[in-house]
Amino acid sequence: MEKQTIISHLYQNSEGCWIIQSNEEHSNGVANFALQFAGEFGMSEWGRVLGQLHDKGKESNAFQQYIKKESGYEPNIKVSGNTHHAYVGGIIARKLYGKSSDNFMINQIISHHSGLHDSDEIDAIINREIEKNLNKELPVEVDINIDRVKLNRPSFSMQANDFHHFSRMLYSCLVDADFLDTESFMDAKSFEIRQSKKTLEDLLPLLEDKLKDLKANSDNSGINVIRNQVQQQCIKMADSAKGFYSLTVPTGGGKTLSSLVWAMKHAVKNGQKRIIIAIPYTSIIVQTASVLRSIFGEENVLEHHSNVDPESVKDEILQEKLKLATENWDYPIIVTTNVQLFESMFSNKPSVCRKLHNIVNSVVILDEVQTLSMAYLQPIVDSLKTYNKLFNVSFLFTTASQPVLSGLIDGCTPKAAFSGIDHVSEIIPDDFKLHDKLRRVQLSINNYGKTYDEITNMLSEHKRVLCIVNTRRDAKELYERLPKDGITLHLSKMMCPAHLSETIEKLKTALKDDRNEIIRVVSTQLIEAGVDIDFPVVFRQEAGLDSILQAAGRCNREGKQMLSTTYVFSLSKEHNLPKGDMQDANSARLNLGSAQDWFAPDTMTSYFRQLYCRKESFDKKDMKHYLYNPKELYLETAAKEFQLIEDNGMNVVVCWENSMELVQQLLVNGPSYMLMKKLSKYMVNINMADFKALQEMGVVSEKKEGLFVIDYKQQYDKYIGLRIDNNWADEVLIQ
């Protein structure tokens, strides 16, 4: 190695030779990646400059000494001076582009390892680093002879709420470029694995063949004729400009495949690169991903959520490829959660933000869109508008219960105005009248409060019946009162995921066997969406209209009867609905009156307007304050505050299957990604009050820091899961 070579990365190969990547090579590599990524939204030169500047601090003597010592290249070398390298590029950016670049270049460069900072911290950070450098702005070794490239202004006009997404998107381009160029040098095998992937143009014929096969092998029954009509309308409407679209199809109308064919053809027509399907429940994700893999092959579908089992893919190379793809979403088809999608859009962490630039120029399907959090609805909808306007993203909202996301809703009491999307184009015209053609259920509503025993007696009159309630306690109480003739099942999140999945599969198998005459199930809301089951009769505890119609979607799903009934009931006063969202939703439904066509889209619109008028805010954590002033972007603070699922509980490992063996493996070998994934299948989430109660009972122990285990078999019931009688049971299950 020549003395003047400035090292960016180095490693020792199997033959003991040192392989070096110079800082010039790395900076050029990052610049080329970032230029390409930012070019997708017209900001290629911004990406290139970020790449060129981000590691200028590595030119200092102190950093060169540091990297040689830490790598073992010169283990005895003395390190003197400030080894922090990220801030140097930020100082140069300020010299070249002045204060106007504070939010769009300085922050990205100084934060490319640590995470984006709040605006008011940036100058303080740089000044602190200058002081560490003996009050010199830059180490004398750093070459600042860099051409000041004129950066073009964005071709799009930006409003106040757009700037934070623009800033974060530039950051995404830089950090993913940095990760990828480093990987190409340090781990060429992984980098090579990433490269083999198909385009949507390659995959579209596979979907078209699947649709032809389905049509050829299906009869001409009414339901199949309707599904074909929906698909043909989606194909017709796919030849449209990038924008906002909705697909409102009742249960049984073939929404999954129809939305997919629209998205694929729309993307190919508009030159969009990938399809991202965001879903609120992991149970729906698993089903949807399975359908997609059967069409496109498992090598073309990325399933990204916390419950994915990495070992479900047997091919080790494909397993590694999918794992790598979760890092930056460079894949043609992605199925993920709403939480993963939206919390990434508001994150400040490099490992999370690196995927954002791959949302650019894509089609996003938001499934069961009515489940979007009301508490964050305004910043979420504003982010959708920004991604459409700045980043060429088309959005498709799919559900049987379409919420109101367009227009302005104000004049409510309390005064909580909601500013929606200017225009959302519905794919299915009114004259299709799908809610009439696909009607297989009627609602019978009784608002008089019933006792547990009265509801149990009503359920016992039916041989096959599903009852959905709002709380874990209600599920437990009703289940324990039901007669145990035939098959009687309980479903709630007091069962660990492995137990829950096993019970749902047992239920599906039982329903397919006509010899199982009696099947009675009591469940919390977890079964309302994404669990493909069919009962002749459904009971649903009072709730919002969207939840009731979701429950009705489990009733006569296959149309085996002319018309079935979903009964809506209330429990007596001592079992009132939990205050908050559930009570608001039920109140909005009750305010519609009783003489309603409950399944009509107009009724759903009226319901959501009633519901919105009961909300004090659609921006619970005040994202507007943190993010809507371009001169003061609190990106770090906003990321901490934007939590769609507030993690107020404690996870405990319960005694089920081989969970205790996994705990022992962890204690002996320490934690690993694969082991923690396996162990997560045996965890139940409880709140702090009940966690403390279990501790006082002496049944929970901390086996390792942060790992709490209940290893008493008698504490975990094979039918209802973790046994505990406390206030946690009254908490509404949202997921």
Q: Where on the chain are the PLM-derived regions?
A:
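Accessory nucleic-acid engagement/destabilization modules that flank
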Residues: 2-209
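Conserved helicase motor
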Residues: 9-12, 303-316, 470-473, 488-508, ...
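C-terminal helicase lobe and adjacent C-terminal extensions/tails of nucleic-acid helicase motors
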Residues: 105, 388, 453-462, 468, ...
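Walker A/P-loop
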Residues: 241-263
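Conserved Walker A/P-loop ATP-binding site and its immediately adjacent core
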Residues: 272-296, 305-308, 404
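Inter-Walker segment of RecA-like/P-loop motor cores
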Residues: 297-346
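SF2 helicase catalytic motif II
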Residues: 338-342, 352-390
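Interdomain hinge/linker at the junction between the two RecA-like core domains of SF2 helicases
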Residues: 401-460
